[in-house]
């Protein structure tokens, strides 16, 4: 487990506009403060990812997403709560409460409550984070710190060390309205 002071330093860096890499359940991720437009666009440029695709928000608990859930049916809240924390990402209507640099061209936003202990601690300190796999567009996602450093040396602001969570595949992505799988895990 990563020492708490390293997580606190990463949180401080994120608050200051940093783009960092960190281990997640299955692959290494890149993240930043979702409300920092400059940081998000820098992350997108580092990955060569078009803004139109949208990004995932991760959190340490469902309450960090409450601002999006005001008019949600109880069934939707139950669906999310029954699968979190864990490797389930839900596409939910963003109701124009999020900027386009997070949602892209979509009417929905991807949300996940992580069960990775280091990332949960980080989100507990800074709130929800942008999280995307640590790889340039078209390349395999990084499964080691070495690969992260090979891909992004000199482009990101830091690497929060630690181990992957042991999952083989990225999270399942489901549509909240239908519970249909959009991407298998």
Swiss-Prot record:
Residues 4-185 form the YrdC-like domain. One of its GO terms (molecular function) is tRNA binding. GO terms for biological process: regulation of translational fidelity; tRNA threonylcarbamoyladenosine modification. It is found in: Cytoplasm. GO terms for cellular component: cytoplasm. Its main location: cytoplasm. Its EC number is 2.7.7.87. Keywords: ATP-binding, Cytoplasm, Nucleotide-binding, Nucleotidyltransferase, Transferase, tRNA processing. It comes from the Bacteria. It holds the Pfam family Sua5_yciO_yrdC. PROSITE patterns: YRDC. The keyword ATP-binding applies. It catalyses: L-threonine + hydrogencarbonate + ATP = L-threonylcarbamoyladenylate + diphosphate + H2O. InterPro entries: DHBP_synth_RibB-like_a/b_dom, Sua5-like_dom, TC-AMP_synthase, TC-AMP_synthase_SUA5. Required for the formation of a threonylcarbamoyl group on adenosine at position 37 (t(6)A37) in tRNAs that read codons beginning with adenine. Catalyzes the conversion of L-threonine, HCO(3)(-)/CO(2) and ATP to give threonylcarbamoyl-AMP (TC-AMP) as the acyladenylate intermediate, with the release of diphosphate. Belongs to the SUA5 family. TsaC subfamily. This is Threonylcarbamoyl-AMP synthase. It comes from Pseudomonas syringae pv. syringae (strain B728a). The lineage of its organism: Bacteria, Pseudomonadati, Pseudomonadota, Gammaproteobacteria, Pseudomonadales.
